[in-house]
């Protein structure tokens, strides 16, 4: 089998590339996905409110685990990643958050990455998006990804939580993806107007599936990339239960889009990485590239949970006898509780003046429950997810076996810097201040977690060690740049090799201030133009907020 391009991974970026590259009818593309189809009749991935279900099984989730995390009481921590058409956009929380303009401007300070500034990237965010309330300087109106804006009046707790943030002295913002990210306000989500999850399989692949120049293979687990000297010329994979490898050649390029965990793992299995690691598994070294799998970053978060005195939380929706009605409303009308991911409000703040842009993120949820659906509090409650945004801690992804079915060794080194501890202590104390504002007086009961007895630095630290969890935002393991630990250049091309690019969240040099999906899609759009040899979209002229000397609180 011969194709112009072979794309490994049908996730948030891979589906963008598959769709854009096949817009040229003379370009042939093979898209390999280790998971299965995105079954449209499966409520677990299609109903926004059911977002916890895919994380509980292995049909749609790789369900990785970390090595024992040394600063987290040696816990082995969850590291869920999407498996199936759509990748992690098929199982994520659907929060559409782009990050802060300063994140991208910071990337662009690196020599060779000047074209990754916010104003260079904004046109690609807009190109990807159709926002339900219409386009403006920041938002698109005719892109493949449906973005829905929360409507006032869905749940009084959302408005009360935003108002509490404002009463505590923080800004209000009408659009966390617009002129000013800093502050509290409504949180956009990747949901269609019909109340369905807007994964990249739905948004992008649906328009490309019927094209004769696109071949999609599901249940196709990539074993390794085939090289002729220093040039990537094809891919070998295992299909279904078969132990006999399938093979295809790429006339132009192999495009690796397997995500921050699997992309470095595939490179290492293919002989690209740290030679010392490769020799442990008798893998012939194709290219010595020590940064492969290093620079692993994530967002860590925790929940502050409160009893709700008024019966307005989503607690009744967790009772089985209420779920058939919720399901029917969603299935037949695309409305009701089922049509929302329930992360309808949130915010970004600076915990201290030394941060030039927000370093703490909030998601508000009108029920007290773990993200993966476990440990639901059996009463009316609400909670605040809070975590730091740009931790200095760095980890790695390293091969443990040549077997493509084997998971790699994943270590985030969460909380390995003093800055991490300071930010989490600040975050808990600030959150308590916000929760004690008058806007929440009629709703706020006792603090369920951490519990009011948890006050000293040592007590807060122990709570974080035992209870903080991943926000499922791994990135950085094939970082873009030109230093000795960089893996790809500013166009995604792997240093020292030909015919091979990485295009996914692994190329982010530094993690962004917010959820990763929107920016991963943007990276796919921007790289698609580079691969096609097109002129980049014209730079935006939109203005954006820079805090400067503005106080953290008013």
Curated annotation (Swiss-Prot):
Keyword Flavoprotein set for record: yes
Binding of FAD, residues: 4-33
Biochemical pathway: Amine and polyamine biosynthesis; betaine biosynthesis via choline pathway; betaine aldehyde from choline (cytochrome c reductase route): step 1/1
Catalytic activity, EC: 1.1.99.1, 1.2.1.8
Gene Ontology terms for molecular function: betaine-aldehyde dehydrogenase (NAD+) activity; choline dehydrogenase activity; flavin adenine dinucleotide binding
Cofactor(s) needed: FAD
Active site: 473 (proton acceptor)
Any GO BP annotation: glycine betaine biosynthetic process from choline
Catalytic reaction annotation: choline + A = betaine aldehyde + AH2; betaine aldehyde + NAD(+) + H2O = glycine betaine + NADH + 2 H(+)
Disulfide bonding pattern of the chain: none
One GO cellular component term noted in the UniProt record for this chain: membrane
Keywords: FAD, Flavoprotein, NAD, Oxidoreductase
Family: Belongs to the GMC oxidoreductase family.
NCBIfam families listed in its UniProt record: betA (TIGR01810), PRK02106.1 (NF002550)
Protein function: Involved in the biosynthesis of the osmoprotectant glycine betaine. Catalyzes the oxidation of choline to betaine aldehyde and betaine aldehyde to glycine betaine at the same rate.
Name by which UniProt lists this protein: Oxygen-dependent choline dehydrogenase
Originating species: Klebsiella pneumoniae subsp. pneumoniae (strain ATCC 700721 / MGH 78578)
Name of the gene encoding the protein in the UniProt record: betA
């Amino acid at each position: 089998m011969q194709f112009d391009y072979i794309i490994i991974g049908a996730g948030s970026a891979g589906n963008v590339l598959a769709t854009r590259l096949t817009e040229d009818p003379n370009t042939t593309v093979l898209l390999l996905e280790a998971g299965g189809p995105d079954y449209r009749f499966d409520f677990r991935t299609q109903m926004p409110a059911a977002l916890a279900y895919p994380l509980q099984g292995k049909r749609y989730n790789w369900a990785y685990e970390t090595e024992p995390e040394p600063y987290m009481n040696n816990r082995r921590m969850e590291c869920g990643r999407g498996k199936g058409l759509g990748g992690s956009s098929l199982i994520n929380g659907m929060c559409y958050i782009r990050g802060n303009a300063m994140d991208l401007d910071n990337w662009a300070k690196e020599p060779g990455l000047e074209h990754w500034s916010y104003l260079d990237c904004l046109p690609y965010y807009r190109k990807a998006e159709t926002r339900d309330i219409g386009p403006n300087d920041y938002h698109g109106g005719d892109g493949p990804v449906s973005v829905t804006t929360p409507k006032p009046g869905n749940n009084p707790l959302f408005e009360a939580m935003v108002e509490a943030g404002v009463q505590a002295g923080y800004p209000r913002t009408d659009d966390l993806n617009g002129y000013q990210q800093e502050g509290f306000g409504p949180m956009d989500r990747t949901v269609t107007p019909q109340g369905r999850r807007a994964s990249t399989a739905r948004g992008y692949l649906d328009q490309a599936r019927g094209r004769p120049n696109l071949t999609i293979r599901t249940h196709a687990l990539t074993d390794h990339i085939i090289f002729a000297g220093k040039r990537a010329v094809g891919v070998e994979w295992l299909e279904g239960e078969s132990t006999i490898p399938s093979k295809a050649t790429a006339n132009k390029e192999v495009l690796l889009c397997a995500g921050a965990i699997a992309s470095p793992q595939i490179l290492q299995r293919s002989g690209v990485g740290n030679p010392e690691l490769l020799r442990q598994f008798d893998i012939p070294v194709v290219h010595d590239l020590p940064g492969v799998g290093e620079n692993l970053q994530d967002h860590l978060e925790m929940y502050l949970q409160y009893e709700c005195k008024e019966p307005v939380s989503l607690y009744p929706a967790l009772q089985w006898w209420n779920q058939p009605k919720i399901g029917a409303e969603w299935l037949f009308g695309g409305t009701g509780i089922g049509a929302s991911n329930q992360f309808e409000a949130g915010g970004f703040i600076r915990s201290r003046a030394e941060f030039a842009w927000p370093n703490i993120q909030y998601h508000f949820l009108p029920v007290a429950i773990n993200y993966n659906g476990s440990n639901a509090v059996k009463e009316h409650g609400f909670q605040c997810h809070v975590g730091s945004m740009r931790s200095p801690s760095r980890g790695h992804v390293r091969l443990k076996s040549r077997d493509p079915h084997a998971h790699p060794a994943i270590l985030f080194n969460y909380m390995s810097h003093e800055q991490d501890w300071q930010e989490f202590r600040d975050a808990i104390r600030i959150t308590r201040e916000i929760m004690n504002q008058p806007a929440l007086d009629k709703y706020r009961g006792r603090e369920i977690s951490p519990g009011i007895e948890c006050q000293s630095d040592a007590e807060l630290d122990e709570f974080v060690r035992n209870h903080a969890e991943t926000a499922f935002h791994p990135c950085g393991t094939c970082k873009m740049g030109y230093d000795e630990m960089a893996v790809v250049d500013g166009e995604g091309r792997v240093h020292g090799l030909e015919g091979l690019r990485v295009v996914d969240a692994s190329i982010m040099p530094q993690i962004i201030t917010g959820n990763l999906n929107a920016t991963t899609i943007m990276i796919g759009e921007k790289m698609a133009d580079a691969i096609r040899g097109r002129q980049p979209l014209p730079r935006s002229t939109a203005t954006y907020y820079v805090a400067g000397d503005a106080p953290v609180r008013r």
